[in-house]
């Protein structure tokens, strides 16, 4: 029954779904708070929340710096419509971050759980630093999920759930999913240290405790799984979900209290320019 319901909703879930994304709002807010706690700006004039989504981070930015000129940027109309309902003073812009440029130099570029979707960080991050005002700061956190069990299981299902153990989806899709966008911490240091006056890089692993029949799937279907659900046809999607849910249940069993443990690692970067 659960599998059938998930299949029926797959086309919807392949798009950004604000209500589904907000299902774990408290857990998604934790790394935002951790990142904010490590930003030492006093009175930033202009803040851009890149990949603002439903405005989880934007609202916290507005509370921290109520006098700042605040801009939320996202590629999803649905997410921006949800964010625009927040009781905060902010402007909202639809844009693809691959090509986005700030209209005016930023005091703070805040990127919560978005840069890992973009490739070639060796060019991306220097380009973002170039849009900061003197003394400005680029602050980002990114899920470091490439080696996570649930991600490897997703790749396994995609590579072997077809008829006779064949792969599913196009070679281009499998290439994108196998590619690593997030760099190692030392490589971020080597990239950013020559370009910044102050640099702080760290990684945190959260032991997330989640509820529900398929909580791991519920978490990733609105983010990492979107390219898969969006590309596979109905039959391929059925095969993939059958296999993937089986693997998830096996590797993430429920605890005695009925909840599921979901370890999740994130990389944090706070890079500041000199004045």
UniProtKB/Swiss-Prot annotation:
Catalysed reactions, as listed in the record: trans-aconitate + S-adenosyl-L-methionine = (E)-3-(methoxycarbonyl)pent-2-enedioate + S-adenosyl-L-homocysteine
Organism domain of life: Bacteria
CDD domains found in the cross-reference section: AdoMet_MTases (cd02440)
Enzyme class name: transferase
GO MF, one annotated term: trans-aconitate 2-methyltransferase activity
Compartments where found: Cytoplasm
Keyword Oxidoreductase: no
This protein's UniProt keywords: Cytoplasm, Methyltransferase, S-adenosyl-L-methionine, Transferase
Classification via Pfam families: Methyltransf_25
Cross-referenced InterPro entries: Methyltransf_25 (IPR041698), SAM-dependent_MTases_sf (IPR029063), Trans-aconitate_MeTrfase (IPR023506), Trans_acon_MeTrfase_C (IPR023149)
This protein's record includes keyword Hydrolase: no
UniProt similarity note: Belongs to the methyltransferase superfamily. Tam family.
Function field: Catalyzes the S-adenosylmethionine monomethyl esterification of trans-aconitate.
Name of the protein in its database record: Trans-aconitate 2-methyltransferase
